[in-house]
A protein has these predicted regions:
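Bacterial N-terminal signal peptides that target proteins for export
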Residues: 1-12
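Serine/threonine-rich, low-complexity intrinsically disordered segments
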Residues: 4, 22-27
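Bacterial N-terminal signal peptides
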Residues: 10-20
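Extracytoplasmic thiol/disulfide redox context detector
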Residues: 16-18, 26-136, 141-172, 189-222, ...
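Acidic, Ser/Thr-rich peripheral helices and adjacent loops at domain boundaries
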Residues: 173-190
Length: 255
């Protein structure tokens, strides 16, 4: 089904698609409550679906059952007025009126509307404290993520992780990793050996909705990298990452 005022979860297809995007436009700012209510009313008239606000201004969400797993759901994210959507389970983004996929440049520019709302300190930092030039949607239980992150660690690469999993069974462990005293080291152990930390205390402030929304904006495929110049790559090779980060360093581009 296409997205013509109808929304459907599409199963994830292949990885390894490399896309380049343009400079960000139309940066989003915080939405007052009245604006959120008006946006939601507009979307509910368009789609006859129940929408809720997300942690990102101007971006709203519905949940749909995952095909062949009716007790699990995946978020579908829709911009105000229904112009564009991110369908978690489908790589990339779509036009809201036709369901046609956005080009790489359109998708990336759409993500970067919210670059100022990304809580960078809440991401899992790896490779020191230098300029941040790459964000990586990664899953500690994903073989592709494990292989890539091992190579990045060996090279001393500086990047920040949006933590995720490849299924729902391991999602309860994400707060344990994030709330551990050293989340960077805990993540490395989890992805490298499968070792998990003790359960997080009830005071843990892990923001599940925030991370799931951010994951959905990246398309849901793990690993996916977003570079500070707007290049977005699914399943990037270590060689590409090294070359891209060197270019960004020479050009002085960072988040």
């Amino acid at each position: 089904m296409i997205l013509m005022r109808r929304l459907a979860v599409v199963p994830l297809a292949g990885l390894c698609a490399m896309l380049t995007l343009t400079a960000p436009t139309g940066a989003q700012t915080a939405s007052p409550a009245a604006t959120q209510r008006a946006d939601i009313e507009t979307l509910q008239r368009l789609y006859n679906e129940r929408f809720v606000a997300t942690p990102f201004a101007g971006l709203y969400q519905i949940d749909r059952p995952i095909p062949y797993s009716p007790r699990e759901t995946a978020p579908i994210l829709v911009t105000r007025d229904g112009h564009y959507s991110f369908n978690n389970g489908k790589l990339g983004a779509q036009h809201g009126d036709t369901g046609a996929p956005l080009s790489g440049s359109e998708w990336g520019a759409l993500v970067l509307r919210w670059r100022d709302q990304i809580r960078y300190p809440d991401l899992i930092q790896q490779g020191g404290n230098g300029p941040l030039r790459m964000l990586l949607l990664s899953a500690f239980d994903c073989p592709f993520s494990k292989k890539l992150e091992a190579a990045l660690a060996a090279a001393g690469t500086r990047y920040a992780i949006i933590p995720s999993t490849i299924g729902t069974a391991n999602k309860p462990f994400l707060p344990d990793i994030w709330c551990s005293p050293d989340r960077a080291a805990t993540w490395r152990r989890a992805i490298g050996t499968g070792a998990l930390p003790p359960r997080a205390s009830r005071s843990c402030r892990y923001d599940r909705r925030y991370f799931e929304t951010l994951s959905g904006m990246f398309g849901g495929s793990k690993p996916t990298a977003l570079f500070a110049d707007g290049t977005i790559v699914a399943s990037p090779s270590p060689a590409f990452v090294k070359q891209k980060l060197a270019t960004l360093s020479r050009e002085g581009i960072a988040f």
